[in-house]
UniProtKB/Swiss-Prot annotation:
Keywords: Cell membrane, Membrane, Transmembrane, Transmembrane helix
Annotated transmembrane regions: 3-23, 33-53, 75-95, 99-119, 122-142, 155-175, 196-216, 241-261, 264-284, 303-323, 351-371, 400-420, 443-463
Subcellular location(s) per record: Cell membrane
One GO CC term on file: plasma membrane
Any Pfam family the entry gives: Proton_antipo_M
Listed name of the protein: Uncharacterized protein MJ1309
InterPro entries: CPA3_Na-H_Antiporter_D, ND/Mrp_TM
PANTHER family: NA(+)_H(+) ANTIPORTER SUBUNIT D1, NADH DEHYDROGENASE
Length: 481
């Protein structure tokens, strides 16, 4: 039996069940733990290859139904997604909020991202793109603050515009090719057709919105900053894998075509702008969660730039960095959540936490070194590959920008670490800290993620070996022609 469809169907079914368990907190917690375990198992027991929903398959050379493609690269992405989702779900069980609604939305988001990553049907991809956009706003609303409601509403308003433009782009491609299946569609994109150019441009608009690239970076950063820390970890994971999923589709359809050269330049520019804007804005922040939110935007720029290069090395580096990023950034957001349980997120009101939580401080420091690209952590491995990919296509200026942004990231992170853990505070503040408990489930999740930062940093091949074959299939050494 092929369990591939269960990666989408199972979380959707569980989301419906959770929605029926309002007020039954104990049942919600038990079922959530079981669901989290199953989410991690499913990617390992599913078979590689194409899966056709509805039993239609291929008819006269055409795919008449919804199709999904599963391969080692997509397995690496979904395993990472499953791990982050499971840890966030477990952490959320220790928080006082509407647990059934939190789990319902989280599972719907998981199913949507899995569908986006697996989709070989562009309209099916769009449907789940819309769902995950609504889910992200809903998760922010759970924070219950006025700022959270405003951030979620702004995101939904912008999403209505971006998603409508993306749907129009899909309509252009359908009108030009006569099919929605991605594998079939790519064979009809060789012709010189203005509608195809328009469709590509509008897909890039949807990509920028979903991933938080300029001009949508401020809206997305506000979404992360106004959520609870563990929910922010989930949101940024969704965004990075939306970016990867949509970029894979764009590369599969257009990479190597002569008219895609301009799109290469646009996508690289968006990635570089996100890197620079993100780190500059992070350096200006006095709120810790806002600082982390802008770093999430900056790191998304690295991913977009690597994938936009379109070469096998660039694609491997981009996907690898996305996987690394969601791991260390989730660790940082969980660290911020633990700190906020003590005394909020205003950096000027924090300090002196090192003696009270030395193990948490150490794990957060590891995650900060990982995001800064310091060896031997995982962030160094993927950033090094990204710089190599830029050099390979004779773009040393991009590699230099990546290094400068990493330096800015390191400065910002060390400043925050000092203000939170090392800055001296008075005795009254220390007593206030001691009266507030540290969420143990969050510490457990932080430990798992920190361990992964170290393990992948020391043994990067355990991830990259899954990526190379698909990257060689998608990649074209366009700039080396």
């Amino acid at each position: 039996m092929n369990y591939l469809p269960m990666m989408i169907v199972f979380p959707l079914i569980m989301a419906i069940i959770m929605n029926l368990l309002h007020g039954k907190e104990k049942a919600v917690k038990y079922i959530t733990f079981i669901t989290a375990a199953i989410l991690i198992i499913l990617p390992f027991i599913s078979q590689y290859g194409y899966y056709y929903f509805g039993g239609h398959g291929v008819v006269n050379g055409w795919v008449s139904g919804i199709a999904y493609l599963y391969n080692p690269a997509k397995q690496a992405i979904i395993v990472t997604l499953s791990l982050i989702a499971s840890l966030v779900l477990i952490t959320g069980m220790g928080e006082k909020l509407k647990n059934n609604m939190f789990v319902t939305l989280s599972l719907m988001g998981f199913a949507s991202i899995a569908a986006i990553v697996l989709a070989d049907d562009i309209f099916n991809l769009y449907v789940f793109f819309e769902i995950v956009s609504i889910v992200q706003a809903g998760l922010v609303f759970l924070s219950g603050t006025e700022e959270a409601y405003k951030a979620g509403l702004r995101y939904m308003i912008m999403g209505n515009v971006a998603a409508a433009l993306m749907l129009l782009g899909i309509a252009f491609l359908l009108a030009s090719t006569g099919t929605l299946n991605i594998t079939d569609m790519k064979h009809y994109l060789l012709v010189d057709n203005p509608m195809i150019y328009g469709g590509l441009l509008l897909l890039i608009v949807g990509l920028a919105y979903g991933a938080g690239l300029p001009p949508f970076h401020n809206v997305k950063a506000d979404l992360y900053a106004r959520s609870k820390g563990f929910i922010s970890a989930m949101l940024q994971t969704y965004s990075k894998f939306v970016l990867v999923g949509l970029m894979i589709i764009i590369l599969k359809l257009f990479n190597g075509l002569d008219y895609f050269a301009s799109a290469h330049a646009v996508l690289i520019a968006l990635g570089v702008l996100a890197m620079v804007f993100g780190v500059v804005m992070a350096l200006l922040q006095s709120d810790y969660k806002k600082l982390l939110a802008y770093h999430a935007i900056s790191q998304g720029g690295y991913v977009a730039t690597g994938l936009a290069l379109g070469t096998p090395l660039g694609i491997v580096a981009g996907i690898f960095h996305a996987i690394n990023h969601v791991i260390y950034k989730s660790a940082l957001f969980l660290g911020a959540y633990i700190v906020s349980c003590k005394r909020g997120s205003n950096l000027h009101k924090l300090g002196g936490l090192l003696p009270l939580m030395p193990s948490v401080a150490f794990m957060v420091l590891c995650a900060k070194l990982a995001i800064s690209g310091i060896p031997p952590f995982n962030g160094f491995q993927s950033k090094w590959m990204l710089a190599q990919a830029a050099m390979q296509v004779n773009m040393p200026e991009i590699a230099i920008i990546m290094i400068i942004v990493s330096i800015g990231t390191f400065v910002s992170m060390m400043k925050a670490f000092y203000l939170i853990y090392l800055k001296p505070v008075d005795e009254e503040t220390l007593k206030e800290y001691q009266n507030k408990e540290v969420p143990k489930l969050a510490v457990f999740s932080l430990f798992v993620l920190t361990a992964l930062c170290i393990i992948i940093g020391l043994y990067p091949d355990i991830v990259t070996n899954y990526l190379w074959d698909y990257a060689k299939e998608l990649g074209v050494n366009y700039y080396l022609k």
